[in-house]
């Protein structure tokens, strides 16, 4: 460190899942260097656990319903994605849910094996009527970041096994700011203020400690340049860290036109993560989903720094016919007539 006074780290616990950390004093400029590194590592590289696939008794695919259950299978899957779990096992483990109606089915009805904990037992999964019965087998695995359902689809899986989007990251949100602080007569040193919010499966303190350990191991490669570093496994790159939260967003947040929104929902695309795993060809196969819908989706994803699976990195929204980049609006020629679309749907 370039200053004689050793930096200190203090924690202010705001809630059980949110803390604010202060690191000071830091040499001018090091606040942003350290803050950005910690933030990206916290969002992308903290290991966690998530449901990767499910199997519902009597169900062959997600586009159906379960007798006696208010929610359809797609809604049940969306609810299960919000399940907060932790696992001490490196291998996949299986949990079971069996409930007879009437009443609500919650995460507390899940029976986890030893080493697995469900941290939000009050979360609602489904609602059963008098004759309703729900039996679900859930596979939980450990991992990092976000993995779309298409990558969780195992070859040779039995009929009825439904892959699920997995959001492994136990960190929900990380923000930081850098203020000035005083050291003796100088007032231009940095004070890093880091705000960390996590799921109930890990404390912000443990998450920050894990991020720090990861960075120390990585920076050790530069410190020990006399050691051959080629081939060392350093884990996934944090370059896509900022996208993890976006993957979990529902497509409702994209503010799409009625045409595009209804087509995607009907196809079973409910989140941004599910959308970016599709190609343009996949979307064009959807009924009523044409090139204008493709352009609209690409523009909306570009605003989040994302793109469709096969979109070229050079995509420029200003080249889309009818779209005004300056105002973020569509001209009459490029816009959709949702009224006409609604009338067409009724026909």
Curated annotation (Swiss-Prot):
This is DNA-directed RNA polymerase subunit alpha. HAMAP family: RNApol_bact_RpoA. Keywords: DNA-directed RNA polymerase, Nucleotidyltransferase, Transcription, Transferase. The keyword Transcription applies. One of its GO terms (cellular component) is DNA-directed RNA polymerase complex. It comes from Mycobacterium ulcerans (strain Agy99). Residues 241-347 are annotated as: Alpha C-terminal domain (alpha-CTD). DNA-dependent RNA polymerase catalyzes the transcription of DNA into RNA using the four ribonucleoside triphosphates as substrates. The gene is rpoA. SUPFAM superfamilies: C-terminal domain of RNA polymerase alpha subunit, Insert subdomain of RNA polymerase alpha subunit, RBP11-like subunits of RNA polymerase. Homodimer. The RNAP catalytic core consists of 2 alpha, 1 beta, 1 beta' and 1 omega subunit. When a sigma factor is associated with the core the holoenzyme is formed, which can initiate transcription. The keyword Disulfide bond does not apply. It catalyses: RNA(n) + a ribonucleoside 5'-triphosphate = RNA(n+1) + diphosphate. The lineage of its organism: Bacteria, Bacillati, Actinomycetota, Actinomycetes, Mycobacteriales. Its EC number is 2.7.7.6. GO terms for biological process: DNA-templated transcription. Belongs to the RNA polymerase alpha chain family. The N-terminal domain is essential for RNAP assembly and basal transcription, whereas the C-terminal domain is involved in interaction with transcriptional regulators and with upstream promoter elements. One of its GO terms (molecular function) is protein dimerization activity. Residues 1-226 are annotated as: Alpha N-terminal domain (alpha-NTD). It holds the Pfam family RNA_pol_A_CTD.
């Amino acid at each position: 460190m370039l200053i004689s006074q050793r930096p200190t780290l203090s924690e202010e616990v705001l809630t059980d899942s949110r803390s604010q950390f202060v690191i000071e004093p830091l040499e001018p400029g090091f606040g942003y260097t350290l803050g950005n590194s910690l933030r990206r590592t916290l969002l992308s590289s903290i290991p966690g656990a998530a449901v990767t696939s499910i199997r519902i008794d009597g169900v062959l695919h997600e586009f159906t319903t379960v007798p006696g259950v208010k929610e359809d299978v797609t809604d049940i899957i969306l609810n299960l994605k919000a399940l907060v779990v932790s696992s001490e096992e490196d291998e996949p483990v299986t949990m079971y849910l069996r409930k007879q109606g009437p009443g609500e089915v919650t995460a507390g009805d899940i029976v986890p094996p030893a080493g697995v904990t469900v941290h939000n037992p009050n979360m609602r999964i489904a609602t059963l009527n008098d004759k309703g019965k729900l039996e679900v087998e859930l596979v939980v695995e450990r991992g990092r970041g976000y993995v779309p359902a298409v990558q969780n689809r195992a070859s040779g899986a039995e009929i009825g096994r439904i892959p699920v989007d997995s959001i492994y990251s136990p960190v929900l949100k990380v923000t930081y700011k850098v203020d000035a602080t005083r050291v003796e007569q100088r007032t231009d040193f940095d004070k890093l203020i880091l705000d960390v919010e996590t799921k109930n499966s890990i404390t912000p303190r443990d998450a920050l400690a894990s991020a720090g350990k990861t960075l120390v191991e990585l920076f050790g490669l530069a410190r020990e340049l006399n050691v051959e570093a080629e081939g060392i496994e350093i884990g996934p790159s944090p370059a896509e860290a900022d996208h993890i939260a976006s993957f979990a967003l529902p497509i409702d947040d994209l503010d799409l036109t009625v045409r595009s929104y209804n087509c995607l929902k009907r196809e079973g695309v409910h989140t941004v993560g599910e959308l970016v795993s599709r190609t343009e060809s996949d979307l064009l196969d959807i009924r009523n989903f044409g090139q204008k819908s493709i352009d609209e989706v690409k523009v909306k994803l570009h605003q989040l720094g994302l793109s469709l699976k096969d979109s070229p990195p050079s995509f420029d929204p200003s080249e889309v016919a009818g779209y005004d980049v300056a105002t973020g609006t569509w001209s009459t020629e490029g816009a959709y007539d949702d009224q006409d679309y609604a009338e067409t749907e009724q026909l």
